[in-house]
Amino acid sequence: MDSADLPPTQKGRHYEIRAAGLRDFAGLRKPEQPLDPFKLAKYAKLLVVAYDQIEPLLTEETKKHLIGEGKDMWSGGAASQPLPDGRKLIILNPTHGKNRHRATLMEEVCHVFLGHKPSRLAIKRKDKQGKIVARDYNADIEEEAYGTGAAALIPYLALKRYIAEGKTSAEIARHFGVSRALVEFRIKVSKLWDLYKKNILATREK
């Protein structure tokens, strides 16, 4: 890839290059083409199951937590053990919208394609700040999967082009089928926020 097609930060370039590989694998040749992580999931041997299908297996206490008071504490979950055919079971939070589901699933797809060792999320201890941390949780791995997934869903080159055209984060989000929050995250980490604000302001003044 040409350096002009990549974000200015080292970490951003790292994620973008890996994201480009994923998009190429998905058969996408243009940066503005939306990526559907649900189509990629089967190649990553991920089986996405609706929450309704596993709900009968859960206790009332668990259900109340997952879709009640704890609904904002999780986006999706992967079974620790694979199915007999080798696929891994993925459950997405039913209280989240489809745009957020796409980002969550894309992160899980990236874990597989990047060769990450699965993180186990059993509670083990509290850190120095008193916050509960998970056993075997690797922040670097989680950041790489999320960053790569976000870059695959919203490529830098397309993002930069749309910002130059004066498109809003909401318009870009609709195009790629993701949340506005994810678009604005990408704008900021790609160091395009100042350009975005300038162009949006200029568009409104016309």
Language-model features, listed with the residues they occupy:
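Active-site hotspot residues in diverse enzymes, especially metal/ion-binding acidic/histidine motifs
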Residues: 1-206
